[in-house]
Structure formats: C-alpha cells, structure tokens
Swiss-Prot record:
Hepadnaviral virions contain probably just one P protein molecule per particle. Residues 288-299 have a biased composition (Polar residues). Residues 347-690 are annotated as: Polymerase/reverse transcriptase domain (RT). This is Protein P. Activated by host HSP70 and HSP40 in vitro to be able to bind the epsilon loop of the pgRNA. Because deletion of the RNase H region renders the protein partly chaperone-independent, the chaperones may be needed indirectly to relieve occlusion of the RNA-binding site by this domain. Inhibited by several reverse-transcriptase inhibitors: Lamivudine, Adefovir and Entecavir. The record marks 63 as: Priming of reverse-transcription by covalently linking the first nucleotide of the (-)DNA. Multifunctional enzyme that converts the viral RNA genome into dsDNA in viral cytoplasmic capsids. This enzyme displays a DNA polymerase activity that can copy either DNA or RNA templates, and a ribonuclease H (RNase H) activity that cleaves the RNA strand of RNA-DNA heteroduplexes in a partially processive 3'- to 5'-endonucleasic mode. Neo-synthesized pregenomic RNA (pgRNA) are encapsidated together with the P protein, and reverse-transcribed inside the nucleocapsid. Its EC number is 2.7.7.7, 2.7.7.49, 3.1.26.4. Residues 178-346 are annotated as: Spacer. The gene is P. One of its GO terms (molecular function) is metal ion binding. Mg(2+) binds at residues 429, 551-552.
Length: 843
C-alpha cells in the first residue's frame, strides 16, 4: 500500500508523538528504508513511457520562457546626463579621509572599466536588430533605432564614424582626451551644430569621415584616372599642422564592406579612416554610412574590390553617396503604397547622419556588430516604457567564451545577521546604474551594436522569392521594398518620429561607452562599485548602516528623523560623485526592509509576499502522477529553492527533484510527496538572526557510538549498526539539540558545521534539518572536544569545558573597514553633535 502523507510525516518525526529520538532517528539513515520510501513515493521511477508535461502554470522549459509582447505605444525612457566623476577616489577622500586598499582597488576597476576578450565574432549588420516581433518588424526597427539614438545622445554609446574614429556626446574623460602620438586622438568641435565642423585648423581629426574621398582619389589614380577629387579633399587641410595620413596605396586593397550576407569580418575595411584630413566636402558627401561603405544608387553596399576602370569611373562621376530615402523623391510612384508618397511629405528631411560633439580615435573597428538588440517591457509593472535588451551572449558561449570574475553575494544567514535589527530603512533608486560605469574606448570594437539600415532590414525580412543582388544595386531595386505593410507602418511612425525617419533609415554602428547589461562583466563591476561606495558611506556616517546589492542601495538608522537627515546628506554626497538617484523612487520601509526578494525585520527574514503568492499558485497548478519535463522541474526548483530555508525540512526535501534534473529525466509527483511539499511551503518560518554567545554543549561521534557534553553532564550511547562517520556526527548533533535545547553546539565535523544536509540519506537529511533549524555550530578541534571521550565510551575522564565564543558571520561584508590613519598635519574634521550619543555598532 502506498505511503500516506500522515504516515510519511510520522516517519520523518515531524509529529510530536514519535518515540525517543535516539532510537527513531538512526533508522532514517537506513538505506533499505530510504529505498522503500522512494519507491512508495515514486521518486526513483525515472524512465516513464507516457509523454512528458512541458508546462506547469507559468513555468515552461528553461529556454522557452514567456514570449515578449510588443507594445506599439512603447515610450523610450529618457536618460539623464550621467557622468561619474573621474576623480571619484579624491572626492571620497576629501569626504572621509584616506580610503582603504580594498575601496581604492574597487574604484580603480571601474575608472575606466576594461573589456578585452581574446576572440570576438563579428556578425553582419543585418543581425544588429533582432527580428523578435515579425508582425511589427518596421515599428520595432524604428523604436529600437530611436532607443539607440537616445543612448548615443546621452553619452552612453560611441558612434563609429570610420574604421578608426568614433564620435560621442557628453563630457569627455581624460582617457578620451588628446593623445596625439598615442593611440587615441580626441577633439571637440567649437559649435555643436550638425554641419558646422569643417574649417578648424587645430584639429587632428575632422568630424567628417572623409577618408573614403581621399582613398578613392588614390585608388583611382592607380586605376589610371585623374586625381580630380584629391584637390577637393586637400582644399582646407593645408593649414592643419599634424596630419598623419597613413595611407599605403600599394599595400592595402580598396575599402569596401562585404555584402552583409557573409558573417566574416572584412579585413580590408582597415585604415580608411586614418586619412585625417579636414574637409569642405562634407555637405556634398553624404557619407551617411558611418562605415566605409559606398552607397550606389539603390542604397545597397557596393563592393569596390576588383572593378574594371570603366565602372570605377562611372561610379566616381555619379552621385557617390546617394541616399536610399531621398532617392524616392525623384522616382515615379510604383503604386498607391509607394514610399515616394511618404518621402514627398516633407521638403527637408534633415541630414543623413548626425555627428557627436567630440571625436576620438579608436582601435580598428569593422563595419559589423558583435551582438543583437531588441526591445521588451521595462519591467512587469511598467509596460508603457521599453527597455533595450543587448545580447552579447557570444561572450558566454562556445569559442568566444570569456570566464567572468566571481564576486561574493551575501547568503541568507549573513544578510539576516547584518540587516535584521530595529532600524528604520529606506532604499535609494540609482537610475540606470549600469550606465554610470565608463568603458575604455579600446573596448569598443568588442561591444558593437547597430543596424544595416531600413532597406536591408525590410529586404531581409521579406526575402521570399526575390533574390536581391546586393552587389549590383540598380534603380529597379529601389521600389522592391515598397509594400502596403511598410507604407502603413511608416505613415504611422511618421506621426511619432517625423523627419527622424530619414536619419533612422540609414545604417549605423555604435559601440558602448558605458558598460552594457548584456555582458557578464557588468554585474561584477556594478557590485564592486556600489559595495565600495557603501563602505565609504558607512565610514563617513557611523550612525548609518548602508548596504548594497547591485543597484539596490539601502540605508538604515535608529530613528525616522535621523534617517531623513542622513538621506539628505548621503544623497548630496552621491550626487557630488556623479551618481544619479531617482528621488521619486525612494522607498521608505519603516522597520521591515524589502531587499533582494526578502522582508527583513527585527524578527528575522521571510520571502516577500509576491513570492509566497507564486508558491501557492505553483502548488495549485502542480499535476500529480504526470511526468514533468526536467526543464520545467528546473524552474519549479528555482522557486522552491529560494524559499527552502524558510521551511521545516529545507533543501533536503527537494533532493528527489534535484536528482531527476541531474539525470535529465522527467519527474512524477506522487500525491504524498506533493502533499508533503505543499504543507512545507504553506507554513514558512522566519530565518532568525544569530546571536553571539558562549558554547556550552558539545557533540561527537564515532561510527559505533555518540557522546555529548552538556555543561558538566556527559552522555553516551551506541548505534545498532556502524554508520558512516558524517552520518554519526549529524545524529550526535541532533541528540545534543533535542536533549539540551541549546542554540549553540560545538562539533568537530565540517559537514555538520556547513549545515548542508543534502548529501545524507534523504529521510535523515529532512528530519535533521528540522531538528537543527536555527542552531549555530562552533568548530572544536577533536583534541579539545569534551564530548570526544564519551563518544568512545569513556565517561570517567573529564576534559575541561571550553569557553568557545561564537560570533555571527556577516559573510564577506566588513561593516567597519577602518580608515588608514591620517597624517597628523591635517586638521581634524569638525564633529558636530550627533543625534545619537553613541555610534551605532552592528547587532
């Protein structure tokens, strides 16, 4: 007969009327019993013949999470001008005195951040914007382009102008300044207009990427043409003192970007940009492509690899840099839905490209992308605004895989020890936290996003029957992209974007100037940054407990009034460092802090309400006696694992699920196992703060017997059959807890000390977790353990009782990093009377 839930509870000693623990508990370690129970609960039966279930409630397989929904009315969020102060270390030192080595090291890591992977795969521009929403392709294209444009305007992206130069907006950092003979050259325009950048004599690098003109002149003279364009390009550049035009006409092939169908990086797009000539040909030369492509009349990239002189000549005489969008103006409408109708709506469509306020030299950057982008809802509660998702997953997979640095995250017990107190709390919202941390420009070639321009994007999506030959763009191809769909979409978008439609229909390549979210390095850097800042804040304001996890910063103080005054001072301090806070999103929590998915109060820690609701929903939807795909089990275990520390039996209760995931088999919930888990998760117990104290109870065991020292009493017992040593030690610890009720137990076994009971026989692990819940362990070397003799059957010999102090752990967070001493000649900082008479120390 299958095991009933009541019987199972009794077996696990979860009921009060169980027999003496010393007899009952060792039985749970018996392998035979564990096997029988597993068979009864159908836990071991992994090879099932009925089809697997692939969806349970909201949980689907690990990689097929809910499909994002496109919202045609998404608004692009605005980004403040974020500029983290470069001398952040000095500013902190003026405020707090000398920083510790740890803080300095962390702050130097992000000033600037560096990312140089050994290998980078370059993808064609077509893959720049992911076709996530096929039915809203055009709308998604423009919204994404607008988002990228907003980021560029906010100084978060560089725009690739030529192979070796980029432009950006916002305040420059010193590593972006003029290094004339080094690798970087930087120059600021006097006026920020779009067309005003031609005649400056000082500059090294003009904002107009006229490399192509000069290069084409050299190329054509080799093809036997008159170097007619040369005079144009040289016109204004005579005055500029240091032109280093590194053009080697003989060694380099002409520039050209491969048709984007192929995914290889084109090594010929090499140093076109290094002709750094000032030029006056900017207005005529719409080199809207910030790459070294030339546009032919149809707007498709023309390759200039091996072109016979005649065609090169016709190319040079015609409108070289013609623009796909503006060409519709002169062509006959092909139908009612021809784009000509839209292009004729406006007389002035604005420039083909915009240029940043500053220019900078960069390492050779191909006209390619290294990751794709798409839009999703900003968060589950805010679906009106969009968020850009950047997929640089190439750096986490395959041959281009980078191993990211690891960083410490406080575990639940450390977090509770730190934050469970009677303080009042508030949390600060750092707006666009990732975009605070600057990236070195030399990392730009590895983090490229962009798009191939509207015609290519549309052509790629609709490339069903028509095979568009990109190499030879001709006039007839111009109308190939006209369609009712595109026409209607563009008309609607015209209301939103107006003449920007023209700008956004051009190709563009952007590199990150601040760290993007889609790279594994970013969370590490953000964690280093905020933890260093909080460490400084804790020292500057000794009455304040500041703590952070990623971009979530919380402040705690003894009274609400004090918290408010601290809030003002700390906000001003953070603003002076260039950290942008969002004052509307500051949350005041009172005495129970919501942080990292937990509610933390003076009573301890529990999961937040929305997680409790998810648990209830999960158990409501959980099918019984149906094999569930192990990928779905991963999702279920993810949720249950988060709340496991708050249940009686903890993680050991989930071991059968873990085992099936590990063996990649389906899992079938029997009614009893489901009822057991359900009951476990419906009553959650808080994880309490550990208290420091003196250890007076000790446990020890040998494979055959156990011994306890409780104060001056000694006890011993034997096991019916010899047990593995770790199991014996765990049993001894359980006996010590149940006999003495002590919350502090000394043991010499590292596995018991770690409080991870998942490797023990399943039933024993579950029961021991419940018995030892809330117990803290202290390590006692075997030689000093007073329970060592009784465990070997010797009761007469007394070892002196140790005075072993226990200090609760706060993980790797050192709350009080003492500042290095200040040299004596500095005057003392003024100390105003504090609202508290004593500096608050952690509980």
């Amino acid at each position: 007969m299958p095991l009933s839930y009541q019987h199972f509870r009794k077996l696990l000693l979860l009921d009060d009327e169980a027999g003496p623990l010393e007899e009952e508990l060792p039985r749970l370690a018996d392998e035979g019993l564990n096997r029988r129970v597993a068979e009864d609960l159908n836990l071991g039966n992994l090879n099932v013949s009925i089809p697997w279930t692939h969806k349970v409630g909201n949980f689907t397989g690990l990689y097929s999470s809910t499909v994002p929904v496109f919202n045609p009315d998404w608004k692009t969020p605005s980004f403040p001008h974020i500029h983290l102060q470069e001398d952040i270390i000095n500013r902190c030192q003026q405020y707090v005195g000398p920083l510790t080595v740890n803080e300095k090291r962390r702050l130097k890591l992000i000033m600037p951040a560096r990312f140089y992977p050994n290998l980078t795969k370059y993808l064609p521009l077509d893959k720049g914007i992911k076709p996530y929403y096929p039915e809203y392709a055009v709308n998604h294209y423009f919204k994404t382009r607008h988002y990228l444009h907003t980021l560029w305007k906010a100084g978060i992206l560089y725009k690739r102008e030529t192979t070796r130069s980029a432009s950006f907006c916002g305040s420059p950092y010193s590593w972006e300044q003029e290094l004339q003979h080094g690798r970087l050259v930087f120059q600021t325009s006097t006026r920020h207009g779009d067309e005003s950048f031609c005649s400056q004599s000082s500059g090294i690098l003009s904002r107009s990427p006229v490399g192509p003109c000069v290069r084409s002149q050299l190329k054509q003279s080799r093809l036997g043409l008159q170097p007619q364009q040369g005079s144009l390009a040289r016109g204004k550049s005579g005055r500029s003192g240091s032109i280093w035009s590194r053009v080697h006409p003989t060694t380099r092939r002409p520039f050209g970007v491969e048709p984007s169908g192929s995914g290889h990086i084109d090594n010929t797009a090499s140093s076109t940009s290094s002709c750094l000539h000032q030029s006056a040909v900017r207005k005529t030369a719409y080199s809207h492509l910030s790459t070294s492509k030339r546009q032919s009349s149809s707007g498709h990239a023309v390759e200039l690899h091996n072109i016979p002189p005649s065609s090169a000549r016709s190319q040079s005489e015609g409108p070289i840099f013609s623009c796909w969008w503006l060409q519709f103006r002169n062509s006959k409408p092909c139908s009612d839905y021809c784009l000509t109708h839209i292009v004729n709506l406006l007389e002035d469509w604005g420039p083909c490209t915009e240029h940043g306020e500053h220019n900078i030299r960069i390492p050779r950057t191909p006209a390619r992308v290294t990751g794709g982008v798409f839009l999703v809802d900003k968060n589950p509660h805010n679906t009106t605004e969009s968020r850009l998702v950047v997929d640089f997953s190439q750096f986490s997979r395959g041959s281009t895989h980078v191993s990211w640095p690891k960083f410490a995250v406080p575990n639940l017990q450390s977090l509770t020890n730190l934050l469970s107190s009677n303080l009042s709390w508030l949390s600060l919202d750092v707006s666009a936290a990732f975009y605070h941390i600057p990236l070195h420009p030399a990392a730009m070639p590895h983090l490229l996003v962009g798009s191939s321009g509207l015609p290519r994007y549309v052509a790629r999506l609709s490339s069903t029957s028509r095979n568009i030959n990109y190499q030879h763009g001709t006039m007839q191809n111009l109308h190939d992209s006209c369609s009712r769909n595109l026409y209607v979409s563009l008309l609607l978008l015209y209301k939103t974007f107006g003449r920007k439609l023209h700008l956004y229909s051009h190709p563009i390549i952007l590199g990150f100037r601040k760290i993007p979210m889609g790279v594994g390095l970013s969370p590490f850097l953000l964690a280093q940054f905020t933890s260093a800042i909080c460490s400084v804040v804790r020292r500057a304001f000794p009455h304040c407990l500041a703590f952070s996890y990623m971009d979530d910063v919380v402040l705690g103080a003894k009274s609400v009034q004090h918290l408010e005054s601290l809030f003002t001072s700390i906000t001003n301090f953070l603003l002076s460092l260039g950290i942008h806070l969002n004052p509307n999103k500051t949350k005041r929590w009172g005495y129970s802090l919501n942080f990292m998915g937990y509610v933390i109060g003076s009573w301890g820690t529990l999961p937040q309400e929305h997680i409790v609701q998810k648990l209830k929903q999960c158990f409501r939807k959980l099918p019984v006696n149906r094999p569930i795909d192990w990928k779905v089990c991963q999702r279920i275990v993810g949720l249950l694992g988060f709340a496991a520390p708050f249940t009686q039996c903890g993680y050991p209760a989930l071991m059968p699920l873990y085992a099936c995931i590990q063996s990649k088999q389906a899992f079938t919930f029997s009614p009893t196992y489901k009822a057991f888990l359900c009951k476990q998760y419906l009553n959650l117990y808080p994880v309490a703060r550990q208290r420091s104290g003196l250890c007076q109870v000790f446990a020890d065991a040998t494979p055959t017997g156990w011994g306890l020292a409780i104060g001056h009493r000694r006890m011993r017992g034997t096991f019916v059959a010899p047990l593995p040593i770790h199991t014996a030690e765990l049993l001894a610890a359980c006996f010590a807890r149940s006999r003495s009720g002590a919350k502090l137990i000394g043991t010499d076994n590292s596995v018991v000390l770690s409080r991870k009971y998942t490797s023990f026989p399943w039933l024993l692990g579950c029961a021991a977790n419940w018995i030892l819940r809330g117990t803290s362990f202290v390590y006692v070397p075997s030689a000093l353990n007073p329970a060592d003799d009784p465990s070997r059957g010797r009761l007469g010999l007394y070892r002196p009782l140790l005075h072993l102090p226990f200090r609760p752990t706060t993980g790797r967070t050192s709350l009080y990093a003492v500042s290095p001493s200040v040299p004596s000649h500095l005057p003392d900082r003024v100390h105003f009377a504090s609202p508290l008479h004593v500096a608050w120390r952690p509980p």
